[in-house]
Amino acid sequence: MAQTITQLYYHVVFATKNRIEIIREDIEDELYAYIGGILNNHGSKLLIGNGTSNHSHFLLSLSKNLLIPSIVGTIKRDSSKWIKTKGGILTKFGWQDGYSAFTVGNSQLAAVKKYIANQKEHHKKHLFEDEMRGFYRKYDIPFDEKYVWD
């Protein structure tokens, strides 16, 4: 082929350090817009971001020039610095060290967007840890509980 053409979608999830409930609703929209800006600066897009006070879900459309570990590291580093500027308890903010990322096919986009949009309602009934265990089982990803949670 004369050129490289890709369409790469990822559902990325990461939690706050020790899953502390620290992300305030009053900064969420601005946080996800900020993360969208980080992605735009790297030739990528945030299709939707949402979560709860202790974790966030993102549906990303990534540039063919990016590797998931490097862009997730950039998102976490830069957004953490931004959140700390909000003052108060947020000056102690941090994301967990790890993350989970799942590929998403075009036919799954609408369902994943809906799932992410409904996070607050979903977590009225389901714990974050149970949610992640469900993903790992659904996608047949081996995991060891000792190393999943920090």
Regions found by a protein language model. Give the residues of each.
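Basic nucleic-acid-binding interfaces
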Residues: M1-D150
